[in-house]
Amino acid sequence: SGGMTIPPVAPDPAKLEPAPKCLDQPPAYFGPKAVMAGSVEEAVYVWASAWANRKPDQVAAFYSPQFRPAENGGATAYIEDRKQQVANGAAPDARLEDLKTKDAGPDRKVVTFVQRFGKDAYVKELTLAKDAQGWRIVAERTLQQL
């Protein structure tokens, strides 16, 4: 029985999906772990990324009006120093390591992580409080240099 062969049909070029664009960075689901939008972890990752990308005003926006520096001196001076450091100092890796969060009261969390600046690494602690703008830093300290 001589069956009829059907020639393959070439796809219509107009119906082809456009080639996917290359991403500047891997999708979020390849990150250290899935991070909920609006979560304290997301706020800390965005803060760290803004610093790594030298965006001083974006970094400064993460500090709450209630921010109190661990060192003596006012919050305004501390945030100005931080902006200078972000703009002109060593840029940290955008990726934070060993990020842990714990509750510190209603709408308040303490987040610890390792932040690397080239060969130097520091264990940092941020205390964040949730306000109308989202999670904002109310305290920041370096726990140790690794």
Language model regions located:
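Short solvent-exposed beta->alpha transition segments
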Residues: 19-36, 41-42, 46-49, 56-104
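Generic N-terminal initiation segments characterized by hydrophobic and/or small/turn-forming residues
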Residues: 13, 20, 93-96, 110, ...
